[in-house]
Amino acid sequence: MAPLLHLDAVSKSYMRGPRELRVLRDVSLDVHPGELVAVYGKRGAGKTTLLRVAAGFEPPTSGVVTFDDVDLSRASRSRRARLHRSDIGWVERAGPRSQELVMREYVALPLYRSAGPSKAERHAMNALAKVGAEDVADARWTNLSDTERTLVAIAEALVREPRLLLVDDPTAMLGMADRERVTGMLCSAAEDDGLGVLMAVPEMPAMLQAHKLRALSRGRLLVPTDPPHGHGAVIEFPGGERSA
């Protein structure tokens, strides 16, 4: 099966005055439909930059990023915008701009114009149910726990029915049980809906339910060790630490 997302020898640099800061170095990575790929790395390893380049928000300095055979770095701004509205979902836990919105309204916002409020909110309730957050449909963002905010943010991305989901550190500030709940839900969403998921996390335990594990260190992906699905794995990470 052809990959949904393909990164080929991708590098990304920024200029800091006269100096060049290399954040990604020759990164090659595939994400196929129906799989969750988790990238582990310490702070500053380049995880967020990797996701932003993979999403087409930032162009690579060199290399190629393709989504379903579309070269994102060469696609027009309007073509990328259409993909972001429909096929490529981005999860961020920023919450609604208006604190007056309840969560079914917030999750429905991306569909209001195309589907109308009533149908949009029905789709929103389905998305909230998919992530196990239907109980907070009538709650406001300020009243949610960290776990509930994470689940609502994922639902807001899923309501568009994307084919690719990019998730930056969904386990931040969560306990172990909630980390496994969130990553397990993402794994199930990938398998049940044929969704490709690329997730960046700083903690090894959050990745145990991923289909593929990748370690990122100083902008480079290390030699992968993939576990059997549903089982943990022991992986050597930078610094000689072992996690299981």
Residue map of PLM features:
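ABC-type ATPase nucleotide-binding domains, specifically the catalytic core motifs of the NBD
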Residues: 15-17, 108-121, 130
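Helix-to-loop junction immediately C-terminal to a conserved catalytic motif
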Residues: 55
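Conserved ABC transporter NBD signature motif
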Residues: 63-71
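Conserved ABC ATPase "signature" region
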Residues: 71, 119-136
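ABC ATPase NBD coupling module
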Residues: 72-89
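Conserved ABC ATPase signature
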Residues: 140-144
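Conserved catalytic motifs of ABC-family nucleotide-binding domains
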Residues: 161
